[in-house]
Amino acid sequence: MTVLIHVLGSDIPHHNRTVLRFFNDALAATSGHAREFMVAGKDDGLSDSCPALSVQFFPGKKSLAEAVIAKAKANRQQRFFFHGQFNPKLWLALLSGGIKPSQFFWHIWGADLYELSSGLRYKLFYPLRRLAQKRVGCVFATRGDLSFFAKTHPKVRGELLYFPTRMDPSLNTMANDRQREGKMTILVGNSGDRSNEHIAALRAVHQQFGDTVKVVVPMGYPPNNEAYIEEVRQAGLELFSEENLQVLSEKLEFDAYLTLLRQCDLGYFIFARQQGIGTLCLLIQAGIPCVLNRENPFWQDMTEQHLPVLFTTDDLNEDIVREAQRQLASVDKNTIAFFSPNYLQGWQRALAIAAGEVA
């Protein structure tokens, strides 16, 4: 049996750690196709914390891509499951035949699907990547991303799959006994990454609610982001009084982040692509509705699960937010497909498809 190899092709420590720990804790014991990994980035204790996995680390995208291509050429029966991708050399290898379509299975994380970067080298690369994506053996993604991908690549097989958000199912009912009243608290963005368009989001929140709400902006990740954090803080202070603006520059531990989310009444996400599903899941679990850009296709997944969705183009006020909270409280969160442990079934099927065990 040729064992499936999983590839984390870009050095994104928090996502890579989440995926590795999920495979170690939830999949490796029951599937031989859930144990072999090639990862761009440093070990940083991951091998020790994931003893059920065999993980090979590479110093960067280029060295990892070269190793993957060599393995693909040496054994055309070898299959690879690419998580997130983010690696131009791998896309070019798929396009040129270095990696065959039958060897290439891709879990879409969002960024490699949408063409949002304005830099010249990205704009030149996008058409090549689009051509390469036509050659993927099978894509795995959210319902919204599958729909988006199918518009340009209708012949590529697509299967529903959700990123393994770290969640405690016992907390699914935690919002039911909470009373919400008084000044609303709104979470803006899911990290300090510029893709959150924090300043535009703060302006949109101010346009809807004025300086009558408290705004919390978590910006502790990525590191070395002080200049942008200060830019967001100053823009926020032009809109909101100091007591109503909380820009968090330190990375929060998971429990502290959960506590922060539970203090919010609304999540506000202005970005036009699917991202931040982890934060969305934790907010929904806590009974906190979310405002999405209508261009963000994840709204399709939310409506499929009978969850209320608010849009950035809606006229919002406190009554509308409280009604969305009421609707969310009536949903049985144990049935939501993208919650833990429900997404496990999708992962087991994805492994079987990528390994060639099921058609």
UniProtKB/Swiss-Prot annotation:
Q: What does this protein do?
A: Catalyzes the synthesis of Und-PP-GlcNAc-ManNAcA-Fuc4NAc (Lipid III), the third lipid-linked intermediate involved in ECA synthesis.
One BP term from GO: fucosylation
Keyword hit for Lyase:
no
Q: What is its main location?
A: membrane
Catalyzed reaction equations: beta-D-ManNAcA-(1->4)-alpha-D-GlcNAc-di-trans,octa-cis-undecaprenyl diphosphate + dTDP-4-acetamido-4,6-dideoxy-alpha-D-galactose = alpha-D-FucNAc4-(1->4)-beta-D-ManNAcA-(1->4)-D-GlcNAc-undecaprenyl diphosphate + dTDP + H(+)
Q: What topology in the membrane does the UniProt record assign?
A: Peripheral membrane protein
Q: What is this protein called?
A: TDP-N-acetylfucosamine:lipid II N-acetylfucosaminyltransferase
